Amino acid sequence: MPTTKKTLMFLSSFFTSLGSFIVICSILGTQAWITSTIAVRDSASNGSIFITYGLFRGESSEELSHGLAEPKKKFAVLEILNNSSQKTLHSVTILFLVLSLITSLLSSGFTFYNSISNPYQTFLGPTGVYTWNGLGASFVFVTMILFVANTQSNQLSEELFQMLYPATTSKGTTHSYGYSFWLILLVILLNIVTVTIIIFYQKARYQRKQEQRKPMEYAPRDGILF
């Protein structure tokens, strides 16, 4: 059976891993990743179109100083995109976030297992926890980079705008990233905290072993022989 200290420290890591899993589920399920404001100006209308979306769903609305505004439109991101580079990169972004979700789940399982058992010398021990959290942080960071690249360089919002308002001409776009996007940083932080807790545990375990060896190293020879 593990010591009380080990149980408490690995349970702490379990809760941070579980927190990471819950946050990623929230990121996947919400659509407040980005709001793109697209200026429109032509003979029939003048104003802005706001497109807010996440990985799966979004909505758009118009604010016009003159002209007849269309009602709000709800859409599925992947469904309205043609077979384009934007759709491919968006799909890869989703894939990496799902991979990070899986690694968070595995980290939760490994940390909980370590809190009730002692698989220290196997991959099920701290090595596995380090591996899954390292991969998870990497996957979610790549997700962040891919999404920014797709919106800024690959003009994902502009492509959605063209699909939603084919008869309207864009005069410029600005982007504002929402809380769903910034929660990715919280996931990375939780991965770091999980690993840090295990590092402190291993350091304390090593120091305890060293202290247990010292009495034997400095004991009188007669006492050792006895």
Curated annotation (Swiss-Prot):
Subcellular localization, as worded in the UniProt entry: Membrane
Keyword entries, A-Z: Glycoprotein, Membrane, Transmembrane, Transmembrane helix
Membrane topology note: Multi-pass membrane protein
GO terms for cellular component: extracellular exosome; membrane
Segments crossing the lipid bilayer: 8-28, 92-112, 129-149, 181-201
Glycosylation sites: 83
GO BP annotations, alphabetical order: sensory perception of sound
Similarity comment text for this entry: Belongs to the clarin family.
Name the record gives this protein: Clarin-3
Species this protein is from: Homo sapiens
